[in-house]
Swiss-Prot record:
Pfam families: Aminotran_1_2. Substrate binds at R21, H133, T350. It comes from Erwinia tasmaniensis (strain DSM 17950 / CFBP 7177 / CIP 109463 / NCPPB 4357 / Et1/99). The lineage of its organism: Bacteria, Pseudomonadati, Pseudomonadota, Gammaproteobacteria, Enterobacterales. This is 8-amino-7-oxononanoate synthase. Belongs to the class-II pyridoxal-phosphate-dependent aminotransferase family. BioF subfamily. The gene is bioF. Its cofactor is pyridoxal 5'-phosphate. Pyridoxal 5'-phosphate binds at G108, F109, S179, H207, T233. Pathway: Cofactor biosynthesis; biotin biosynthesis. It is an enzyme of class 2 (transferase). Keywords: Biotin biosynthesis, Pyridoxal phosphate, Transferase. GO terms for biological process: biotin biosynthetic process. CDD domains: KBL_like (cd06454).
Length: 384
């Protein structure tokens, strides 16, 4: 089969299955609104949970950082790309989250891939929640370790898998708050199970850090758990981009020697690190923002009662409305756009077959009347 035939067949099948993805260039966008093709919408698809992407303190920090350090790092952190703002940010993150070290990555995807690729060896075992992010599952499947997936958020299922004897090291992988369902991992029993097997726990808390726990320290802090490997990202509640791994001194030094995503990639721009430092300050002092977000979540869930779709059991900013069929959820998303609500339809392979959904995300930037407008639109389109 020629390359062109393979590509065309894959695209045709993706269209026929109702799973074809498209991008929509947006104009002005923030945690509350966005514009597409000249039309303005209330934005219920962003991960800007605290509305910090347009916060003046964060924007000015990036501008001032760019004026001082330029707009790029100019090289790998192992060459000339590691500057004072990145070093300061790593120290601040480690101190804030109670770890010895933090290492910056250009994205959460890169952090997850780098850690698993560098840490795992033949005969090792990875036990991952079935609904973990694609970056985690892909890295695990490509590693030399054996991957076993346990039932979503089921410590008992994990315990059964862990009971089998193995030769190498054990790594348990989960998320703090799951990106497509919005529910929280049972971190305490999961961590205890890993420790009982002399294993380590890796938690990707992309959707928890900033929005839960004291000072927004995240899911692990909230549940009183300190995993051996903690990934936090800055593209959600922090409103910026990038990620960090929190770990021990020895683990950090090991990854600086063996994590190819760190060694062979241009480092995070110093100006970006300046913006993240400013966002960190906003997060630490952001109890009012978290209270506003919590109020918006409560308002939405109370008003969503009676909708025909299945509203997932979630108290996080991620509020999935399960519709099931791909074409139905696409039609519902279009009808919501007609009412000036931008809500993204999520379909397989991102979510399991038969669970296509509207992934509704809420922000502290939303106003009460924004939530009410969305609810009115959902109820109006529910039977169409």
């Amino acid at each position: 089969m020629a390359w062109s035939q393979r590509i065309e067949q894959a695209l045709v099948k993706r269209r026929l299955d109702g799973q074809y993805r498209q991008r929509h260039p947006t104009g002005q966008a923030d945690g509350r609104t966005l514009s597409v093709a000249g039309h303005n919408y209330l934005n219920f698809s962003a991960n800007d949970y605290l509305g910090l992407s347009h916060d003046g303190r964060v924007v000015r920090a990036w501008q001032q950082g760019a004026e001082r350090y330029g707009v790029g790092a100019g090289g790998s952190a192992h060459v000339t790309g590691y500057r004072a703002p990145q070093a300061e940010l790593e120290h601040q993150l480690a101190d804030w989250l109670g770890y010895r070290r933090a290492l910056l990555f250009i994205s959460g995807f890169a952090a997850n891939q780098a850690v698993i690729a560098a840490m795992m060896a033949k005969n090792d075992r990875i036990f991952a929640d079935k609904l973990c992010h694609a970056s985690l599952l892909e890295a695990a499947s490509l590693s030399p370790a054996t991957l076993r997936r346990f039932g979503h958020n089921q410590p008992s299922a994990l315990a059964k898998l862990l009971a089998a004897e193995g030769e190498g090291e054990t790594l348990v992988v989960t998320e703090g708050i799951f990106s497509m369902d919005g529910d929280r991992a049972a971190l305490k029993p999961i961590h205890q199970l890993a420790r009982d097997r002399d294993g380590w726990l890796l938690v990707d808390d992309a959707h928890g850090v900033g929005v839960c726990g004291e000072q927004g320290r995240g899911s692990c802090w909230q549940q009183g758990v300190q995993p051996e490997l903690l990934i936090v990202t800055f593209g959600k509640a922090f409103g910026v981009s990038g990620a960090a791994l929190l770990c021990s001194d020895a683990t950090a030094e090991y990854l600086l020697q063996f994590a190819r995503h760190l060694i062979y990639s241009t480092a995070m721009p110093p100006a970006q690190a300046c913006a993240i430092q400013a966002a960190l300050g906003c997060v630490q002092q952001g109890d009012d923002l978290r209270q506003r977000l919590a109020a918006n979540i409560t308002r939405f869930r109370q008003g969503a009662r009676g909708l025909r779709g299945q509203l997932a059991s979630s108290d996080s900013a991620i509020q999935p409305l399960i519709v099931g069929d791909e074409q139905k959820v696409l039609g519902l998303a279009r009808r919501l756009r007609d009412r000036r609500c931008w809500v993204t339809a999520i379909r397989p392979p991102t979510v399991p077959p038969g669970t296509s959904r509207l992934r509704i995300t809420l922000s502290a930037a939303h106003r009460e009347n924004d939530i009410d407008h969305l609810l009115e639109a959902l109820h109006a389109t529910d039977g169409e």
